Amino acid sequence: MGSNNGRAMKLALVPLPKGSVLLPGVTLRIPVSNRPDLANLLSALLDQTNLGKRDGNTITFGCVPLRSPLLSNDGQQLIDDGSVDGAKKEEFDAIDAGQARKEDLFRYGTVGKVIGVQRRAYAEPFLVVQGVQRFTIKHILRERPFFEGEVVLHNERDAISSDAETVELFQQLRQLSRELITLLRLSSLLPSTGTRLSPLVARKFEVYIAKTDLSQAGNLADFMADVADPTFEEKLRVLASFALRTRLERVVELLARQVQGIKNSVKVTTISTSSFPSNSPFDISQIDPRDRELLARRVMAGLTGLTPPGAAGGRNNEDEKETNEVDELQKRLQEAELSPEARKVADKELRRLRKMNPANAEYGVCRTYLENIADIPWTKVTEDKLGPETLKRARNQLDEDHYGLETIKKRLLEYLAVLRLKQSTNQDVERQIAALTKELDAANEVLAEKDVPALSESDRVSLEAKLNLLQSRRLADKSPILLLVGPPGTGKTSLARSVATSLGRKFHRISLGGVRDEAEIRGHRRTYVAAMPGLIVNGLKKVGVANPVFLLDEIDKVGGANFQGDPSAAMLEVLDPEQNSTFVDHYINIPIDLSKVLFIATANSLDTIPAPLLDRMETITLSGYTTVEKRHIAKRHLIPKQIRANGLAEGQVVLSDEVVDKVITSYTRESGVRNLERELGSICRHKAVQYADAVDNGRLDTYNPVVALGDLEDILGIERFDEEIAEKHGRPGVVTGLVAYSTGGQGSILFIEVADMPGNGRVQLTGKLGDVLKESVEVALTWVKAHSFELGLTHDPNEDIMKNRSLHVHCPAGAIPKDGPSAGLAHTIGLISLFTGKAVPPQIAMTGEVSLRGRVMPVGGIKEKLIGAHRAGVKTVLLPEQNRKDVKDVPQEVHDGLQIVYVRHIWEAIRQVWPGAHWPGQHHINFVESRL
């Protein structure tokens, strides 16, 4: 391997990326990303420069390639390519330059000088290094934070020999180098769109080769070895060749193989080595036109180091590769079972592809188009798990994954039942069709053999009519288009996954939030550069079947009409069960059947969904979870999930129902359970710290897995939300109303306070009230003023109760916005309580809208309001009669703990609040009841 009588020195070492070798006189780009060793090395070199220990204009270090399992540590070839043991190969492939060990490094390397840093837009930076001098590693001094070793440098001039054999090898090197450059100059025959070697660059190569003498033979060998693009092992052997003769032999062998490979690829057998002198042009007109085109392509391949088949490190014949690609594409199209329209288009494009020059830009466009057609699942479907246990299995799956949500579960089970019945009906029809077809085939065989009809003409016509009738009775599977509407965190997305699991179908999620270009839905037309199919077709390609479950997430956040089109309008065809069997993507431009796809869309609000799009979907509303439902979800799903996520085992964190309820009501106020899961995660992490400390200190018996109510403030901080509790004593002008929070899923009681004072009839409203709530106060006051005589508030029907009096109506928690008409009944009762001096029992709460006629009208959020009332300690609740149906959704424990009274008129509510009181207008109560 040459003399080792070089100078020993300490040198920082940088492992090169896999497959890279730096030779003297050659430049190499080293990626900087994910290389902590390189960053530490550059930082240390910069510190030395600042301290004056190093010239800041020259930064050098050793560039060491990774070892190869095919070579010994001295660069000797051990075994042939391809026969290496699989375990060794996998071990070698897994080596990362940034995490390399000293055992992974090659014995030889090159001193590299940093000549610059390159970084293109939106790309990782590269360190540009130029090879200076070979060295041998004696031993590694350290591995971290960067490699450093003691190396022996080798002087190139010491290896120069002027014997006749070396001179002959040098002449062969120059001749083969000129010949290769001449062949590479033929790249100018290629179209302008292809990769080509500039004649100016080729001319500079020729000048450099011509000026090189024997003293620079080693540099020329290193340079041409890099140009010839050998295999990784061949580069390592060149690097390990310190002796000039050995190096020349190996490089001459590489160049000869490269030149001969280019010649053989175009079948030019009459051209000898002497035919390519640098001063005589190559006569391309003497070659057959077909071979001329192939030569141009082969020369382009020569830029990357083409070698003939069978040679070490060689590549397959490019023409055969292109032919194999087209044949493989044709095979894929045949296996795809295309529709008749798709088959017609694919055959036409395939014929065009075979006639096209691969160097043509349209070749890649056409091939990509055919590959997309082949990837679409035209007929391949997933067999649904539809059997006697289908509904039971699906019900168990949905109940296991989600608590509550009975409405959506019911609708999905209905779909499964219909699908099961359709399949049974189709199976019966198929059996009848098979029997009739068999009978007709038998009759045709008799007619063909004996020339005598086995059936009369009338019987044959009758059988064919029955066959056509049966074929028309086949039930098509048109999947519904479901729209799940509800607040965030209520399980809409996970519910769609459960549907796919229960059906046994593949699942794909398409996020529509922020989509503003119609082409993202329906694809780009092929005339555009880099055109591709839309989200729908790409989803089908990804799942590989024609009947998946598609989740169209956040469909309410699709962008509206703009200069790029209207994405929501593009969804009309996708989500129309009558049209999506012939959906046309702009890129594919062939009808695609989407009728077997089960589309489930999700939205937080219906306000931003266009009416035509909304009309095509079946809307199912998911209300927020109640406190009771959240407790069940936390105990069944969230707490076990967080215990596992934080490295704890079952039983190492115990939360009682009271603790969970406290977290729900005092630390979260949301419709879903996302924030609840975060808070439970904080509790589990707190207990994980305690458990880890107990284990580390050997005092595991002191660890208490139980989380008490008093621990919550230390873990989660002070309570973020205060819960209203029913008063123990009533006072005039104060009434308990019911409220459902706008976040959904939670309700509570709301105290309404009314006070009067001397004034001019003015009414002041405070508590951050909305316009609707203010109007309900005005309606309540108008009704009380109109019936003040019947209520015993005045002695004369014409007397104004507000004369010389002003009112102030206040709703506590003034920082929280409040709106809605549901407090009308509570406002009316509060005004009557203030004017009569009768206190409202604190255990009574009420909700309902009031009209000027005194009718109590229905309101929303009954379920949440009743749960909040039960939690606050209310015993009796007054509800509008028309809300009786809504009470069916209330949990049984809440229903049993409340006395629910339904009222239709204010007079009925008055009698329920003050049952023993006598009113001057008592006869009006009886009159109203008789009218109702």
Swiss-Prot record:
Whether Cytoplasm counts among this entry's keywords is no
Which protein family is it in? Belongs to the peptidase S16 family.
Please give the name of this protein: Lon protease homolog 2, peroxisomal
Active site feature: 822, 865
Ordered alphabetically, the record's keywords are: ATP-binding, Hydrolase, Nucleotide-binding, Peroxisome, Protease, Serine protease
> What taxonomic lineage is listed for the species of origin?
Eukaryota, Fungi, Dikarya, Ascomycota, Pezizomycotina
Q: Where is this region: Disordered?
A: 304-340
The record places domain Lon proteolytic at: 729-916
EC number of the protein: 3.4.21.53
Q: Where in the cell is it found?
A: Peroxisome matrix
